[in-house]
UniProtKB/Swiss-Prot annotation:
Organism, scientific name: Legionella pneumophila (strain Paris)
Protein known as: Putative glutamate--cysteine ligase 2-1
Domain of life: Bacteria
A Pfam cross-reference name: GCS2
Lineage: Bacteria, Pseudomonadati, Pseudomonadota, Gammaproteobacteria, Legionellales
GO MF: ATP binding; glutamate-cysteine ligase activity
EC assignment: 6.3.2.2
Protein function: ATP-dependent carboxylate-amine ligase which exhibits weak glutamate--cysteine ligase activity.
Length: 373
């Protein structure tokens, strides 16, 4: 089946998807509560959309399409409040975080949906290990060529989003030493990584995608687990590297950071993207996952080594006029605060050092999601 035409969207509109953890309040482990949560949400007036995820201890929510930070944040608060209310009725906690600190993958149950069952049959145990939680950010594009230009221009900024959103230091009761351990699980899938370097939509659709479809490996764009991928049915590019933050404020701020970056890149303020930019892509990605804001990057154009935290601060200065135009100054101030106060991964480690139990770490995550304003 040919790839559908790229839908025209209003430029720089944005939307957010969040994968959230469903927590038993008796032991703070994940709980297979999504069927019950989904049933209750279906009876409520939900201010967005909600869908199951691959295991029953997960829930995905999505916002509407927005142009500005205030609108996006307002809806995320409304979604959060609705989720908390429904969770309270079932005695289920809901929180962010890229991984649950001590859940065992083998205990997870695949949600009864045809696609999820097919994925489970194909990938085996990896499917249950995919009980991880990310934020996806969509940015509207006017056409497919523009989408591919932005997708490849953003490649050097992927480490920013990994480090700023990092919230997955613990896996199966161990400190992984990573700030974002979640992405290691994604990399296990054969169709993960980055998109092929193609800047023309017809070439991507008729050349690359049709060839991949003819191999029998893929049926749709959903089969690609790329860090950034085009979504022709939405008319967007979708960034998939972010851990789910602990608060909806951070989720909104990350979306607006991407929005401002796209506005900046569309003015051709940087050299055009090139295939060789990807020579350092996996190394820079690793640095952000492992060391977070303390990582060191190799600039893809100059091969200069730069501190990740300083690169974010330099970028924030460049984006200031674009944020002013987009009414997202407050969002970028939040990003600035992360560079000084630390990421959610740092917060979770601090709470573990304070309380010495991972159950307490989960409880702190629940408080962050519920009480943020």
């Amino acid at each position: 089946m040919p790839l559908q035409p790229f839908k025209t969207s209003n430029l720089l509109t944005m939307g957010v998807e969040l994968e959230l953890q469903l927590i038993s309040l008796s032991n703070f482990d994940l709980t297979a509560a999504s069927p019950d949560i989904l049933e209750l949400l279906g009876r409520s007036s939900f201010p967005g959309s909600f869908t199951p995820e691959i295991t029953e201890s997960m829930l995905e929510i999505a916002t509407d399409v927005h142009e500005e930070y205030d609108q996006l944040l307002k809806q995320l608060f409304h979604i959060r409040d609705t989720l908390v209310t429904v969770g309270d009725r079932l005695n289920i906690g809901i929180c962010g975080g890229g991984t649950h600190p001590f859940q065992m993958w083998s205990n997870q149950r695949i949600f009864n949906k045809t696609r999820f069952i097919e994925v489970s049959e194909l990938y085996g145990y990896l499917t249950k290990q995919f009980t991880i939680f990310g934020q996806h950010i969509h940015i509207g594009c006017e056409d497919g060529n523009q989408a591919l230009f932005l997708l490849h221009s953003l490649n050097r900024y992927i480490p920013h989003f990994i480090a700023l959103s990092a919230s997955s230091p613990f896996v199966q009761s161990k400190d992984t030493l990573y700030n974002s351990a979640r992405l290691n699980s994604v990399f296990a899938f054969p169709l993960s990584g980055r998109a092929p370097f193609v800047l023309n939509w017809d070439e991507f659709s008729l050349g690359y995608f049709e060839k991949m479809e003819h191999t029998g490996i893929v049926k749709s764009m959903k089969d690609f687990y790329w860090d950034l991928r085009p979504k022709p049915e939405f008319g967007t590019i979708e960034m998939r590297v972010c851990d789910s933050p602990l608060t909806v404020e951070r989720a909104a701020a990350l979306a607006c950071y991407m929005q401002a970056l796209c506005s900046y890149l569309l003015e051709n303020k940087e050299p055009l993207p090139h295939e060789d930019d990807y020579l350092v892509y996996n190394y820079n990605r690793f640095q952000a996952c492992r060391f977070g804001l303390d990582g060191t990057l190799v600039h893809p154009k100059t091969y200069e080594q730069i501190l990740l935290r300083e690169d974010i601060l330099t970028t924030l200065r460049r984006l200031k006029p674009y944020a002013n135009q987009l009414n997202s100054t407050m969002a970028l101030e939040h990003i600035y605060e992360i560079t000084h106060k630390g990421s959610d991964a740092s917060f979770l480690r601090e709470k573990y050092a304070e309380h010495r139990t991972l159950e307490s770490v989960v409880n702190e995550s629940l408080k962050q999601f519920r009480s943020s304003k």
